[in-house]
Amino acid sequence: MGPPSAPPCRLHVPWKEVLLTASLLTFWNPPTTAKLTIESTPFNVAEGKEVLLLAHNLPQNRIGYSWYKGERVDGNSLIVGYVIGTQQATPGPAYSGRETIYPNASLLIQNVTQNDTGFYTLQVIKSDLVNEEATGQFHVYPELPKPSISSNNSNPVEDKDAVAFTCEPEVQNTTYLWWVNGQSLPVSPRLQLSNGNMTLTLLSVKRNDAGSYECEIQNPASANRSDPVTLNVLYGPDVPTISPSKANYRPGENLNLSCHAASNPPAQYSWFINGTFQQSTQELFIPNITVNNSGSYMCQAHNSATGLNRTTVTMITVSGSAPVLSAVATVGITIGVLARVALI
């Protein structure tokens, strides 16, 4: 190792700022009897990242430092030693090539692994040979992968099917969370979590359960969320409605009826008059009706996915006489006819 008189170029800017702050605090603070302490930044670190062990309240008469892996000073656990006077760092048996010691006694460990989890001890060597020691620690968690969701049924039928979502992969010491349409999971007796929250089960699905589902995995050092999975709930048809609700007509009017039923996928419609099939359309149009068009008009809605049919019936009565032309209209027609005769 070369002399760590200045942070190496590979050091990220945040560590430079932290080290500078620590150095200034050490320089400006007057001698105190405060106890030597170690701060880990961060305390929880993701695998592959880096962690900085900061020393606080260094004694004034220090002449060197030694860092050890573990909670006690042991030659076999020595990571690196540093002599202030010569600014020389000497690696020990526990040195892995990922550690960098700084003049303010801070230790940077890069590309951490889960094996790095644990305690680290700093020994400050003083000119009076009354050395001081302090121990710090940090925890390394795995860098979480992007999870994915599998489902046993992405097109369930309302009030008939149950759906089980599973968030994968399984990772130890990890929290599993679920999101529905971008919101946290609602409280419902039909929603059940199991297998450490990895599995979300929807019992007897409802149409309101349709939407986007995501799972998120978390540990104290990182988090990751899956791509959304869409749940398409098949339902209906509900009992259809016929509009307009008008029931009484006069001869010569036009009859225009429309049928609608809530359904997923959209319903297919059929019309029956007095029990006789007429046509398969959502609208029924009969121009210039007569009294013979009176009767029962039934609309049938069919869902090809659920296999269900729903019907509704309206009674249409055609009575009275055809609309009579007004006197003004009659005079207008007469004048028009006479004018055509005169031209001939």
UniProtKB/Swiss-Prot annotation:
Residues 321-344 form a propeptide. It comes from the Eukaryota. It is found in: Cell membrane; Apical cell membrane; Cell surface. One of its GO terms (molecular function) is protein heterodimerization activity. Keywords: Apoptosis, Cell adhesion, Cell membrane, Disulfide bond, Glycoprotein, GPI-anchor, Immunoglobulin domain, Lipoprotein, Membrane, Oncogene, Repeat, Signal. Residues 1-34 form the signal peptide. Its main location: membrane. It is a lipid-anchor; GPI-anchor. Gene3D superfamilies: Immunoglobulins (2.60.40.10). Residues 35-142 form the Ig-like V-type domain. Expressed in neutrophils. Expressed in columnar epithelial and goblet cells of the colon. Expressed in numerous tumor cell lines (at protein level). GO terms for cellular component: apical plasma membrane; azurophil granule membrane; cell surface; extracellular space; membrane; plasma membrane; side of membrane. Disulfide bonds join 167-215, 259-299. GO terms for biological process: apoptotic process; heterophilic cell-cell adhesion via plasma membrane cell adhesion molecules; homophilic cell adhesion via plasma membrane adhesion molecules; negative regulation of anoikis; positive regulation of cell migration; positive regulation of cell population proliferation; positive regulation of endothelial cell-matrix adhesion via fibronectin; positive regulation of heterotypic cell-cell adhesion. Belongs to the immunoglobulin superfamily. CEA family. The extracellular N-terminus Ig-like V-type domain is necessary for homophilic and heterophilic intercellular adhesion. This is Cell adhesion molecule CEACAM6. It comes from Homo sapiens.
